[in-house]
UniProtKB/Swiss-Prot annotation:
Cofactor(s) essential for the protein: Mg(2+)
Inducers of expression: Moderately expressed in the wild-type strain. Expression is repressed by the HTH-type transcriptional regulator PecS. Weakly induced under oxidative stress. Expression is 10-fold induced during infection of Saintpaulia plants.
Family: Belongs to the HAD-like hydrolase superfamily.
One annotated Gene Ontology cellular component of this protein: cytosol
InterPro entries in the record: HAD-like_hydrolase_sf, HAD-like_sf, HAD-SF_hydro_IA, HAD_2, HAD_sf, PGP-like_dom2
Species of provenance: Dickeya dadantii (strain 3937) (Erwinia chrysanthemi (strain 3937))
Protein name as annotated: Probable phosphatase IndB
Keywords: Hydrolase, Magnesium, Metal-binding
Binding site for Mg(2+): 8, 10, 169
Statement: the UniProt record of this protein carries the keyword Metal-binding: yes
GO molecular function, one term: metal ion binding
Gene: indB
């Protein structure tokens, strides 16, 4: 059975958070619902868009204004952020994914984006070909931090929790991993602070993508690579 590493997308593989925040602001301004609190918007990254806009606008996710905001945001993201995607890939990601793939790992993405948006971003960033499976929030009944997405990835790819690790920059990612019984690797270059990540009790927190590779080896017992535990 091949070891499986599942990655979050925004803030883990691609440095999209600032673009996401700007797209939120532009979309709401376009709809005459101005909201300029960048910190509050940034805090919602990692949630499905409906929940994020519902939280920001203090509206139920079923409200038509939330639906309109999501639709407008997606249009703005396509126009403003996707063209920049090749330059937004975090340092070491391409090399690390290629190394893991070459060493026999199965690779997947589990994201709070809907599948079509995730596919568009991965393709624009030049990362699509590395992944055996991409799961979006619209492919499960319960998105992160619920374990369903992690369990579905393992089921589809024939993996088990003992040989699976989740890599992410938010507690949503790490809590999903914990509840699914798999190892969790937190990364410090994304949305949540190191203290926030520690609160989710991952097995390890790393500062560079090359350390992700070493942590995967160590946690999945494929080598004696050193790893610094929290």
């Amino acid at each position: 059975m091949k070891p499986l590493v599942i990655f979050d997308l925004d803030g883990t593989l691609v440095d999209t958070p600032s673009g996401i925040v700007s797209a939120f602001i532009t979309a709401l301004r376009d709809l005459s619902m101005p909201f300029e609190d960048r910190r509050a918007i940034r805090a919602t990254i990692g949630l499905p868009l409906e929940k994020a806009f519902g939280q920001i606008l203090a509206l139920p996710v079923e409200d038509e204004r939330v639906t309109a905001a999501v639709r407008q945001y997606q249009a703005v993201f396509r126009e403003q952020v996707l063209p920049q995607a090749p330059g937004l890939v975090f340092p070491g990601v391409v090399e690390g994914l290629a190394l893991l793939k070459g060493q026999g790992y199965t690779l997947a993405v589990a994201t709070s984006k809907v599948f079509a948006s995730a596919k568009a971003l991965l393709e624009a960033a030049g990362l699509w070909s590395y992944f055996d499976l991409v799961l979006g929030a619209d492919m499960v009944a319960h998105p992160k931090p619920h374990p369903e997405m992690g369990l579905l990835a393992m089921s589809r790819l024939g993996a088990d929790a003992a040989t699976t690790a989740m890599v992410g920059d938010t507690t949503h990612d790490l809590l999903m991993a914990k509840q699914a019984g798999m190892a969790a690797i937190g990364v410090t270059w994304g949305i949540h602070t190191t203290d926030q990540l520690k609160a989710a009790e991952p097995q390890v927190i790393v500062d560079t993508f090359s350390e992700v590779v070493g942590a995967a080896h160590a946690l999945l017992k494929l080598s004696s690579s050193p790893v610094s535990y929290c």
